[in-house]
């Protein structure tokens, strides 16, 4: 099973046997004494960062699987013919053992018999306060989230950078904590994202790298993207191609990168939301956040893991999510401006052109959509 997903952990692997269970683990970086502590607890973990993990622990009562609150880390399980419970971070790792493959839902725990939820996103009472106070607290929580993940990465870290509000936020907040921040952008020649990413990289003085993608390179990468993505969903595949290629470039420089996923879901970043009644906004944002594990987070995990790196999703830190859900809806969608409170929170830390940039779909900003549409026709 480990051979099928060896790319997820190029730095090493181990087999843990305890309490009648055999568990394998691969890792992306040399392990510290903390890994020995996990082994002593009969525990293996696929960890993206604090609060983002999939975990399996063998006890005298059996094997328990736990997935993080929003499903940043993937986790699948199944029963073999002899009723042995098997699990893995990707479906392909399990297919020789069983075709009974199921997903542990985000925020759930499974003991081999019962699936039990330990976390649900819920509507929260809106906080009261001035725009300035709420923006300041949001910036503080985002900054704390990023700083913790920089520390976990040993201060050797990069950021995927599209030049959009969310990826620029991650890069700007990471920059003060490292001597050198590597940033990576991908797109077809003259793609809008490349221009905006260059501007942002210059603004924060990052070590910037570009991947200029040709149509033939996209077609060559497509089978690999589908293999790692484990999906034929057209929208998911289309948005994953440049993500996969930029992740490949980043893996030559850093073991971990920041990604801006979660910002649109928490702060009302999608165009269709503008036509909704404001009172319906909290439920809609919770719904699309709950679906991230099978959309953007699947893209981010598979793209980074395919090249042995970790993608940190700072917007989905539990402290950030908790606060974002309490921000009043009219501060997220304000006078027709999406993510308004996030723009206020990052005022002064980003160029005005980035602060004012409207949302573009991932594949459109990278220039991929038109070429793939022409090919399909």
Give the label of every model feature segment:
Residues 183-186, 210-212, 283-284, 356-361:
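RNase H-like polynucleotidyl transferase catalytic core
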Residues 133, 137, 141, 165, ...:
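Generic recognition of stable, solvent-exposed alpha-helical segments in well-folded globular domains
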Residues 129-133, 161, 187-189, 234-237, ...:
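Short, contiguous acidic/charged loop-to-helix segments that flank catalytic cores in large enzymes
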Residues 1-228, 348:
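Cysteine-centered catalytic environments shared across enzyme families
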Residues 155, 206, 231, 255, ...:
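Short glycine/serine/threonine/alanine-rich loop segments
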Residues 189-247, 272-282, 302-306, 326-333:
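ATP-dependent adenylate-handling ligase core
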């Amino acid at each position: 099973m480990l051979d099928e997903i060896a790319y997820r952990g190029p730095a090493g692997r181990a087999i843990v046997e305890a309490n009648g269970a055999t568990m394998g683990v691969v890792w992306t970086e040399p392990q510290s004494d903390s890994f020995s502590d996990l082994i002593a607890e009969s525990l293996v973990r696929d960890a993206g960062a604090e609060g983002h993990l999939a975990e399996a622990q063998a006890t005298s009562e059996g094997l328990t699987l736990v997935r993080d609150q929003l499903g940043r880390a993937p986790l699948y399980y199944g029963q073999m013919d002899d009723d042995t419970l098997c699990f893995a971070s990707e479906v392909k790792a399990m297919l020789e053992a069983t075709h009974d493959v199921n997903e542990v839902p985000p925020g759930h725990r499974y003991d081999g018999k019962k699936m039990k939820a330990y976390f649900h996103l819920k509507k929260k009472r809106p906080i009261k306060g001035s725009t300035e106070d709420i923006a300041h607290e949001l910036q503080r929580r985002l900054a704390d989230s990023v700083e913790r993940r920089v520390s976990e990465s040993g201060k050797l870290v990069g950021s995927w950078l599209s030049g959009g509000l969310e990826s620029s936020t991650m890069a700007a907040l990471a920059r003060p904590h490292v001597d050198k921040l590597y940033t990576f952008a991908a797109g077809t020649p003259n793609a809008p994202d490349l221009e905006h990413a260059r501007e942002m990289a210059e603004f924060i003085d990052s070590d910037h790298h570009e991947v200029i993608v040709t149509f033939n390179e996209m077609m060559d990468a497509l089978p690999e993207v589908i293999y790692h993505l484990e999906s034929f969903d057209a929208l998911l595949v289309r948005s994953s191609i440049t993500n996969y290629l930029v992740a490949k470039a980043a893996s030559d420089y850093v073991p971990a990168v920041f990604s801006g996923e979660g910002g649109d879901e928490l702060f009302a970043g999608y165009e269709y939301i503008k036509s909704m009644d404001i009172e319906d906004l909290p439920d809609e944002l919770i719904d699309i956040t709950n679906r991230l594990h099978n959309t953007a987070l699947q893209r981010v995990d598979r793209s980074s893991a395919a090249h042995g790196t970790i993608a940190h999703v700072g917007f989905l830190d539990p402290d950030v999510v908790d606060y974002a859900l309490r921000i009043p809806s009219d501060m997220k969608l304000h006078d027709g401006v999406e993510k308004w409170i996030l723009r206020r929170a990052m005022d002064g830390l980003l160029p005005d052109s980035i602060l004012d940039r409207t949302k573009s779909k991932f594949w459109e900003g990278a220039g991929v959509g038109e070429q793939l549409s022409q090919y399909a026709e």
